[in-house]
Amino acid sequence: MENTKTADLFNDVMGPIMCGPSSSSTAGPTRIGRLTYDLCGQGDYKKVVIEYSSHTGYSHGRGSGTTKGVTGGLMGWMPDHENLFYSLDVAKERGLDIPVVITEDPVPHVNTITLKCSLNNGMDISTRMISMGGGSVAVYQIDDLRVDLFGGRYEVVVWGDSAAQAAAQALLGRAPVAQNDHLAVFSREEEADIDAVRNLSGVRYASQLYPGVPCVTRDYAQAPFTTAAGMQAWQAEHGGSILDAAFAYQSGISGWDQKRIMDWSLHLLDVMDQSVQAGLDNDGRGFFCVRPVSHALKELHEKKKFLDTGILGVATVAATAVMESNMSMRLVIAAPTGGSAGVFPGVAAALAEAGYTREQIAESLLVAALVGAFIYNQATFTASVGGCAVEIGAASSMSAAAAAYLLGGDTKVCLDAAGLALRNLTGLACDPLASGVEVPCIHRNAMGSANAIVSANMALGGVDPVLPYDEVIEAMYVFGKNCVDNNWACGRIGRVGAQGTATGQRVREEFSRKAPMD
């Protein structure tokens, strides 16, 4: 299944705010569980079966908190719930029966999750949803009805015959976006009176899915452009900087004004700061292959025992700290993914060290988000589809544009910086040891921050990436997909890259024996 949605800067690129370690394998599944909770009358079920196909990475069941995420969502939790790490224990305490079954069923996407629910009213409801990358989700199927929903609106689901569906349409004031002879789905910008729908004659059951995102998708939401080339054409007509373009883009999608957009950007910076501190204070929860080291790195930097790399030392500490927080299932921001959550905070810390103000760095975050939207709109943010370049590479590319903007670069320079950074990491394999977002993901975030800073400086100096930015995205995505199609991604075989080494195989076997199903 290809992505057909236009990115929202906060819903899909700089967000969600989530507990780690993975946006595709933790945050997305949590949202899938939560949407199913809504679909089933706010968790009005006596049993739910989680099904992972053997054709998905989820069937391995260890290291990325997928089942913890789904289970938390099924209890009504969102991806930022502070107790997500303990969701399996909480579910047991509440007496919830949520078995996991591995099937051989074909699936539309490698990140597909099927949930089969038995409600207290005697109904059975099944859902098939997809974690699209970066915490974004798609509702693919409800019972036997194929749908295309993305969790950003109020979706009213009505079980009933054609007369009941017609009555619901009259009450809700809009036609269904999907229907068959016994089920219809209505999509709204505003919350519906679900009790009124349930009381309609002929309605067997009705429920409402709630948007689990900061920005509810409007009825007539439309970005003024969706690609880098489109932005440049828009600027040729309207003028303005790349920051002005970011404001115009997000306003078109969400309806938010500039103040509200800036306020949220500043809020995201606050969360990133909290993530850095949580990483520095890390107790090692959730680690398997390595131990937390960001605090030691900070001490070495402060004692000047690093090679003198200036602000790169600051970036290294911050990026590593965020990823160690992420690995412990503590709060981070998918920027654009959980696996790359440390890259932008690393660059932001370096920019702060260089003397830029909070407001300036918040502006640069919006520039980064806009560049990330171009990747989302033309490629993906999930390494299981496009390799590591769509995560670490994307984050580094976004951060390079942000740094170039604060250095005084115009739109061309910002895009050149983004292009250089992404080209540098095109072809980066997704070959984690064992599973999860630990090795090499933590290390690569620091590298991604450094690559962003170097690329920004190169672009300011006039280095030409030659390819337009949209073509850099295309090249990266095509190459990454080809690698994935040959099983060079995310440990699907466990015999490629670092996974194929003697140590890689040993670590994988130990992990399979010792790590809990999560």
Task: Give the positions of each predicted feature.
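Conserved phosphate/anionic-ligand binding catalytic regions in large, soluble enzymes, centered on
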Residues: M14-L35, M329-V347, C388-A395
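Phosphate-handling active-site elements
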Residues: Y37-V49, W77-E82, L351-L365, L406-A417
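Alpha-helical support elements that line or immediately flank enzyme active sites
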Residues: T26-G41, A163, P345-Y356, A400-G408
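A glycine-rich helix N-cap at a beta->alpha junction
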Residues: G69-F85
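Short glycine-/aliphatic-rich beta-strand segments at the starts of folded cytosolic domains
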Residues: S126, D144-D161, H182-A184
